[in-house]
Amino acid sequence: MKEVTVIALEKPNSYVLTTPGELVYLLDCTESELQKAVKELENTKNDVVKNNAIDYMTSLAIIPTYNCNLRCVYCYANGGRENNSIDINTVKKAIDFKKKEKPEAKILDLYLVGGGEPLLNFTLVKEIIEYADLLFKEVIVNVVTNGTGSKEVMDWLIDRKANIRVSFDSVNQEKQRPFSSGVNSHDIVKNNIKYLISHDANIMVQCIITSYSVNKLKEIVKELQNIGVKLVKFEPCLMTDVSRGEKSLQPDPRIFAEKLVEVIEYVANNNVELMIDTGYFSKPMDGHYCGMADGNFTITPENMITSCVEVSRKNEPYSDKVMIGEIKNSVLLNDNNIDFLKNLHYKNQRGGCCKCEYRFICLGGCPMANIWQNGLPLTKSQFTCIVEHIFLPKILTKMIENDKIINVMCEEPLIKYE
């Protein structure tokens, strides 16, 4: 029997039923009609679709360097504090391990991520990809970058058909993401985004929303629209034990949730060709929130293997649990930590998540954010919980009032109306 949750909407006598893989709207229904629909959904069969492509793919994430040319006021990794880069031989051992672990894999899904600016040591990055190309038929390059690279770097990303996530805070860039010298980085990043878009690059923009910028989401959207951005992710600034900056940078979760709803409505009502990834609305499922608990394998400049980029140094809090191995002469995995991380699931999370009506959408929120806020054992984050409980009923209600909102929120919504 399927688990089904019932979410009451702001519209009277209207509900959303969620079960893994599906959202069902019940509009203007009686209590008996609601109970009948719940029982019917509980008794439907689960459609299990096997993704055969996974059998031929493996993945690896790399933090190429801790060095960074920006000094973002909220940096989760305090990038630029050190300038050491990963050793190419460490990377080769990791790539060899991934090939040996799954010899049938023809595709390597390779992520270049921060700790610093991944593309700053461009020669090293090219050497990494060239080696991966020798072992795999196809290497999919995924990059999270601050977007300050040279034309040579941008052209390489275009030629590699990379999936590019550019961190750009738009109207807040000068205040929040200056160069290490203090110079404004806005124009160089904006121009690089325009260049990538003009060459049909696969690009999305990520905006970090602070207490300074939470009231400027519409201004951000207008600038992104003007330069042709089609996909943006709004990410709240969540300060941690290792990030740069003051706790006051974190926005009020209630204001953030309200402004998120407002900007989605603005995009829908003004026919702006922009999709918004909120991180707070997703296809209902029952798995782990992210790969931290289920397979993340990220190598660091210290030759460590971490399950989360927010813990990338051996001396950082929770590294004794979040690090899953190290690379010396070979890859050495910590099976105890791997087993521990598998338990980072909302069903094991303190705070009532296992009974919450939003659990299939929220999945308990980012486990590392929960740990930063509350330590261990895993306990729900109040920030995430407040946002979800304000945002979801509002946005689910507005979806039935304005179907354009669905197109802003999700590419292929699994929604039924009854």
Predicted regions and their residues:
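N-terminal [4Fe-4S]-dependent radical SAM core
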Residues: 1-61, 104-105, 418
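A broadly conserved sequence feature marking short terminus-proximal activation segments
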Residues: 30-43, 299-334
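Short, flexible, mixed-charge glycine/proline-rich loop motifs
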Residues: 52, 65-66, 344-348
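Canonical Radical SAM [4Fe-4S] cluster-binding loop centered on the CxxxCxxC motif
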Residues: 54-90
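Radical SAM/AdoMet-radical enzyme domain recognition
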Residues: 92-113, 121-237, 249-251
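Radical SAM enzyme [4Fe-4S]-AdoMet core and its adjacent flexible, acidic
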Residues: 177-190, 194, 198-293, 298-306, ...
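Flexible mid-to-C-terminal extensions adjoining Fe-S/redox cofactors in radical SAM and related proteins
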Residues: 315-418
